[in-house]
């Protein structure tokens, strides 16, 4: 009974809506990674901002609890290959950029693996349910792929895309061979 609680936004909008260079850089990033709207980009920027905020807080925290939290932050960022250094420091976390997170999206990974010809086609395959991760169908293009799941991205077995002679697959394979 009663109304469900109102969920908060998972992103922060820009402080000023009409800054030309920000709009231009957002447009370039959106085209490169096949994002449909700016909200997807703002969600990833907010996630990066939260990681950086946590790192800034941990730089000033010299207690043992601060050390444990730093190790946990490093483990999360390493799990998703956002942070690739062997001996990471909090300065490495502060130097991360938006591309390091966008590279780990399922949409980008499907495109980079050659399962789709373009980033937009990769998005379509994911939304239509043609892509599986670890044998499970994933329909969210913004799903962050962990390092353990890198090699487990494939077509869903009962999908028409799983057929080797599907027109879209043969076109993608012939383009790779040229």
Curated annotation (Swiss-Prot):
* Span list, region Disordered: 157-178
Please cite one Gene Ontology biological process associated with this protein: ribosomal small subunit biogenesis
In what residue span(s) does the S4 RNA-binding domain sit? 104-166
Which regions span the lipid bilayer?
A: none
> What UniProt keywords apply to this chain's record, in alphabetical order?
Ribonucleoprotein, Ribosomal protein, RNA-binding, rRNA-binding
Q: Which domain of life is it from?
A: Archaea
Return the InterPro entries for the record: Ribosomal_uS4 (IPR022801), Ribosomal_uS4_arc (IPR022802), Ribosomal_uS4_CS (IPR018079), Ribosomal_uS4_euk/arc (IPR005710), Ribosomal_uS4_N (IPR001912), S4_RNA-bd (IPR002942), S4_RNA-bd_sf (IPR036986)
- What HAMAP family does its record include? Ribosomal_uS4_A
Subunit text: Part of the 30S ribosomal subunit. Contacts protein S5. The interaction surface between S4 and S5 is involved in control of translational fidelity.
Do you know which NCBIfam families this protein is assigned to?
PRK04051.1 (NF003139), uS4_arch (TIGR01018)
Functionally, this protein is described as follows: One of the primary rRNA binding proteins, it binds directly to 16S rRNA where it nucleates assembly of the body of the 30S subunit.
Tell me the protein family, please: Belongs to the universal ribosomal protein uS4 family.
Know the name of this protein? Small ribosomal subunit protein uS4
What species was this sequence derived from? Answer: Methanococcus maripaludis (strain C7 / ATCC BAA-1331)
